[in-house]
A protein has these predicted regions:
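Left-handed beta-helix
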Residues: 18, 23-24, 29-30, 35-36, ...
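C-terminal segments of enzyme domains that contribute to small-molecule binding surfaces
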Residues: 2-15, 74-89, 97, 136-174
Length: 174
């Protein structure tokens, strides 16, 4: 069995569902909750020392992501069946269910995504920006350029399911 780097902070210990996968090179600190069949990949850091971070069921937090919170200003909640791409920064934001956040994007304090949003790689969501469901978001600062298509919704579903399958393979030791 591989040990997972879980660190308590001021008596708060990360809670990881027994079916979740957390890579041994990830780091979870403080008030972190990881839901059923979620996956946290190498070099991801979820540092909940200023407030809670919640990762819902079947969501993947990919390599090099950083999640944090600004004390008394924001919270970080990621909905179910989301894909958070490599090197994304989640800083005090709320992501609805079935969203895809593209690689290298930055979501700042109190930014909110409705369900089925697609954030293009490298986008910057500035503080307090709120996006309705099915928004395709692009740029720096991020703006809604159109509605997410049915094909993109299929891709979002394919993405979280493929990471769920990969996590199962890692748990088996394949």
């Amino acid at each position: 069995m591989t040990l997972v780097p879980i660190e308590s902070f001021e008596h708060h210990i990360p809670e990881v569902h027994s079916s979740a996968f957390v890579h041994c090179a990830a780091h979870l600190i403080g008030q972190v909750q990881v839901g059923e069949e979620a996956s946290i990949w190498p070099c991801a850091v979820l540092r909940a020392d200023h407030g809670p971070i919640a990762i819902a069921a079947r969501t993947s937090i990919q390599d090099g992501c950083v999640a944090h919170v600004t004390h008394d200003v924001s919270q970080t909640r990621i909905g179910m069946e989301c894909t958070v791409g490599h090197r994304v920064v989640l800083h005090g934001c709320i992501v609805g269910d079935r969203c895809l956040v593209g690689m290298g994007s930055v979501l700042l304090d109190n930014a909110e995504l409705g369900e089925w949003c697609f954030v293009a790689a490298g986008s910057l969501l500035t503080p307090n920006r709120k996006f309705p469901p099915r928004s395709f978001i692009l740029g720096s600062p991020g703006r809604r350029v159109r509605e997410v298509t049915a094909a993109e919704m299929e891709w979002i579903t394919h993405s979280w399911k493929s990471y769920q399958d990969l996590a199962r393979r890692y748990r088996r030791g394949s």
